Amino acid sequence: MVDIDGTICTQIRPKPDDPNHKPHKERIEKLNKLYDEGHEIHYWTARGSGSGKDWRAFTKKQLEDWGVKATSIHCGKPLYDIWVDDKAINDKTFFDVNNDSIENR
């Protein structure tokens, strides 16, 4: 499960369609490599959770334009202050570690 804003692209609030929204290409490449190796990569974003706007079509096209490979793309992730999960990995930690440690999870 991978977040979008602030994880694979710059975090710009409140509008995901801001033209200054830029992909983190090296992060996308790492996730695409995992996808190519057979891992399921599901993207889940809170886009629209606060505003009620449907960002699905825009988000799908944006990820396609950035070359993102995905098993699925979902909008409507709940807004929260902290995420606690036994499989959670902070994005900065994930992108600084070797994929071998992730594959064994």
Label each PLM-derived region with a short phrase:
Residues 1-105:
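Catalytic phosphate/metal-binding cores of nucleic-acid and nucleotide-processing enzymes, i.e., regions
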